């Protein structure tokens, strides 16, 4: 397997134009404790704001699909994909480009910030699951 850089790919800046915003619905009660419902409301509002400018997809546990759809309305898509937490920027895939229109996905090995959370197997499978 080759490395993306060997094939002429590089990681665009976070602010570079892209075709979709991916988010993960907050699920880990230990992270958010009594604030989980409020955090979900904020995530929903952020998704709706972004959706005014570009497509947004929430990955969500199968049991939360209806809740996410109800919370975000028709302007935000959902994808049923089991996960442990909502930090998709850390455990999700990276999309690299070659500057000629080609896009590739990269999946890194996720270990929940040095095994901070022992239960992170579903998060470790998110990037490969999206790719």
Region spans (language model):
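The feature marks the mature, well-folded catalytic cores of soluble enzymes
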Residues: 1-131
């Amino acid at each position: 397997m080759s490395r993306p850089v060997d094939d002429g790919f590089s990681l665009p800046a976070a602010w570079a134009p892209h075709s979709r915003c991916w988010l993960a619905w907050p699920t880990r009660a230990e992270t958010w404790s009594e604030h989980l419902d409020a955090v979900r409301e904020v995530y929903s509002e952020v998704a709706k704001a972004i959706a005014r400018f570009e497509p947004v997809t929430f990955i969500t546990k199968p049991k939360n699909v209806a809740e996410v759809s109800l919370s975000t309305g028709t302007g935000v898509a959902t994808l049923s994909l089991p996960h442990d937490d909502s930090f998709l920027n850390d455990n999700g895939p990276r999309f690299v480009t070659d500057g000629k229109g080609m896009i590739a996905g990269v999946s890194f090995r996720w270990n929940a910030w040095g095994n901070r959370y022992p239960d992170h197997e579903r998060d470790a499978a998110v990037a490969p699951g999206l790719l």
